[in-house]
């Protein structure tokens, strides 16, 4: 399931919430849906962490470049 795009995972999570809120959804179905939702949430959380790490890395790199350029101009 790790291959699913983030947006698709979020869309499926919304579908699961809708299904679980239906009175006609059985307990067994709700449990299966909950398990699927748990797996999807883990995937989404992992993708968000990776994106945050990448943004932090790019920001640090940009800041290092700016500091280096400022030092060059100061000399």
UniProtKB/Swiss-Prot annotation:
GO MF terms held by the record: exodeoxyribonuclease VII activity
Organism domain of life? Bacteria
What is this protein for, i.e. what is its function? Bidirectionally degrades single-stranded DNA into large acid-insoluble oligonucleotides, which are then degraded further into small acid-soluble oligonucleotides.
Q: Which PANTHER family match?
A: EXODEOXYRIBONUCLEASE 7 SMALL SUBUNIT (PTHR34137:SF1)
Q: What is the designated name of this protein?
A: Exodeoxyribonuclease 7 small subunit
Please give the subunit comment from the record. Heterooligomer composed of large and small subunits.
Q: Name one Pfam family in it.
A: Exonuc_VII_S
UniProt keywords (A-Z) are:
Cytoplasm, Exonuclease, Hydrolase, Nuclease
